[in-house]
Structure formats: structure tokens, C-alpha cells
Design a protein with these regions (language model features):
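Soluble non-transmembrane domains of integral membrane proteins
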Residues: 1-194
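Interfacial loop/helix-cap signal at membrane boundaries in integral membrane proteins
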Residues: 4-8, 175-229
């Protein structure tokens, strides 16, 4: 709400209670503006890469205010990029089931903006992803732009109404993770994040490359050697297609036998 002071990047927060963030001990931050409205954040961390932020606004005044959920990731400059066809490094999102990949130079030329009901957004490196997961099933607008810095952000299109002597609460999740399949798929499943597995660059033949990866990974864990794992998955593929190849050869042989009869 433009009529009140809200926290900024320069706000000095007070820490309530525990001062060290660990997987077993969240930290709580608090700040009260001159109008008497208190903003609270509780930041917790799991045993891997997930930051959960519970945001609360407490209104002890007689006024009524509207607040919009908001989150932003900033990259100060373009990193060293590997120019590889199937590897995307830049701004990324899935919005209502559609994968969005924007290169840094594209965003410098033109801003990207779209509204959606579900999805996630972030900035992708070769081995790492930093991502925001907005509150789901609530319409939000995602924007990728460049103003001296690369910015990936979202803002809710509908406000949360805060009445007199009342409070509101909203949750935001941030994942700063290595692009490991077990980690990414684990968060996609446990947090019900739509198409979060597309964080990993599977290429255009996603429906083939991902099952092949799981097959090779299975045999690697079983045999302890990637060379043997590749041989094993190759044998499995040949066994799957053997009946089809055998049928094709039988048909060809039958055709050769029929040719003299036709003469």
C-alpha cells in the first residue's frame, strides 16, 4: 500500500530470539513502521537447499490496507557462459505448464512479462538454480527485466486485505540448489511444484533422455562403473527392440520367398 511505509532492502530488522539459522532453528525478524504496523518474517531452512519464509503483517491501527505478495532474484552481471545448444543459462520459469527460457542478452533488449496461476521462476546456471515459488493457485505476474541488474520477480495481481486490529500471513519458498536429479525431483514432488524437473536441461527429447538417465544411473549404482552401466543399458535397449527387428527380418524373408511364386 503506497500510503504506508513498507520494508526495503535498507530496512534494519530486529531479531527475535534465536540468532543463528540452522535446519532445526529458524530465525524471526521484526520491524514496525511509524504508523504502527508490524512486519514479521520467519525464515527456516531444511537439510538441503530450501528456504521457507513465512511473512506476517500485524495491523494495530484503525486503518485498512492492501498488500501484494512479492519476490525477486537479482543477478548483478552476466557470468561466464558455456555456449552449448541444450544448456540454458539465464532466466527461466514454468508458467501454467509452459517452459520459459530467456537469455541474458534478450532481456537486455526487451522485458518479458506474463501472468499465471501456477509455476515458478528463477535464474539458472550450469550447475545451480536459484528459484522462487510463489503462492500457488493465486494469479501472479512474472517479470524478467534488466535495469543495471538482471531481475526475475513476481507480484500477486490480487491484494491481501488487512483490516483494523488484524493480521495477514503469506508463505514464500526459495530453492538455491545444485542441479541434481534426486534433489530437484524430490522438491518437485514434496512441494508439488509444477514442472520443476525442467530446471535440468534434458534437451528436446526429454521423454527419451530422462528415462535413459535413470536407466544408466540404476546400473551405475548396481555395477559401480559408468562404462559397464552404458553397456548394460545398451543390452536392455537391444532386447526391447529385438522382437521388432526379428519380425522385420521374418517379413523380409517371407517376401523373398513369395517373389518366385508371383512369377
Amino acid at each position: 500500500d503506497k500510503n504506508i511505509d513498507i520494508p526495503t532492502s535498507e530496512t534494519i530488522w530486529s531479531i527475535k530470539g534465536n540468532k543463528k539459522l540452522t535446519e532445526n532453528s529458524p530465525i524471526k525478524l521484526s520491524w514496525t513502521n511509524d504508523q504502527g504496523i508490524t512486519f514479521e518474517k520467519e525464515i527456516s531452512l531444511d537439510d538441503k537447499y530450501l528456504f521457507s519464509i513465512k511473512q506476517r503483517v500485524i495491523n494495530k491501527t484503525s486503518g485498512k490496507y492492501d498488500f501484494y505478495s512479492y519476490g525477486q532474484i537479482i543477478r548483478n552481471e552476466i557470468p561466464d557462459i558455456i555456449d552449448f545448444l541444450i544448456l540454458h543459462e539465464g532466466l527461466i520459469a514454468t508458467l501454467d505448464d509452459e517452459l520459459i527460457e530467456e537469455d541474458y542478452d534478450d532481456i537486455q533488449e526487451k522485458k518479458f512479462a506474463r501472468t499465471a496461476q501456477k509455476g515458478w521462476l528463477g535464474i539458472s546456471d550450469k550447475y545451480w538454480i536459484t528459484s522462487l515459488i510463489p503462492p500457488q493457485n493465486k494469479e501472479f505476474k512474472t517479470t524478467f527485466d534488466y535495469k543495471d541488474k538482471f531481475r526475475a520477480n513476481f507480484i500477486a495481481t490480487e491484494p491481501l486485505e488487512l483490516g483494523p486490529n488484524n493480521s495477514i500471513e503469506e508463505n514464500l519458498q526459495i530453492i538455491v540448489a545444485a542441479k541434481r536429479v534426486d534433489v530437484i525431483d524430490g522438491y518437485a514432488k514434496s512441494l508439488a511444484i509444477d514442472k520443476f524437473d525442467l530446471v535440468i536441461d534434458w534437451g528436446f527429447l526429454y521423454f527419451i533422455t530422462k528415462p535413459l538417465f535413470f536407466g544408466i544411473d540404476y546400473f551405475f549404482k548396481l555395477l559401480g562403473n559408468y562404462g559397464l552401466a552404458i553397456i548394460a543399458i545398451t543390452i536392455c535397449i537391444r532386447l526391447v527392440f529385438f522382437p521388432l527387428a526379428n519380425f522385420s527380418r521374418s517379413e523380409e524373408h517371407t517376401s523373398e520367398l513369395q517373389s518366385p511364386c508371383n512369377l
